[in-house]
Amino acid sequence: MTKKSHFLKTNYKPLKELIKIKNIPNPTIQDISNLVKEIRSSKLPDPKIIGNCWSFFKNPIISKNKLEKISSIHKLIPFYKLSDEKYKIPAAWLIEKCGMKGRIEGQTGTHKEHALVIINLCAATGTEIYNFSQKIKKLVLKKFNILLEEEVNIID
C-alpha cells in the first residue's frame, strides 16, 4: 500500500465504455480493479465451471519493423502503440491466426470464444496442458517469428 498518487490507465476501450455506462466520473483504484474483473468475467469462462487460468500468455511487445512485416501480410492486425518503436499485439489474435481458437486435443484445448484461454476439460494433466501450450508457442513462432511468453506460473 502507498499514499502516493497514482495515474490510472483507463484508455482500454471496454474499460472506458464501462466507466461511462456506470457513470463513474473519477474512478478509484478499487473501481478500476472491480471493473476489470467484471470485464474479464464477461469475456472469459468461469474457472469453477470450465477449468482454466484465464489468460495463459502475455501479449507480446514487438518492434515497429516486425509489425510492418506482419501487417504487410495481415492487413487487419490489431495492435496498441506503446512508443514510436514498440507495439503490443494481442496474443489471442496470433493464436487464432494459427488455427488454434477452439481447438481441443485430448482433455485440453483453447476456449471456443477466446484463444488465449487454455481449458481443462476435466481430466487433463499438468503435462498435457503444458505440452499443448508449447504447441501453441511453436505455431506462433513459426508463423509470426514471435515467441509467446507465459503469463501463468509453470510449476514442475
Give residue ranges: language-model regions.
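Phosphate/pyrophosphate- and phosphate-bearing ligand-binding catalytic cores of soluble enzymes
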Residues: 1-118, 123-127, 143, 147-156
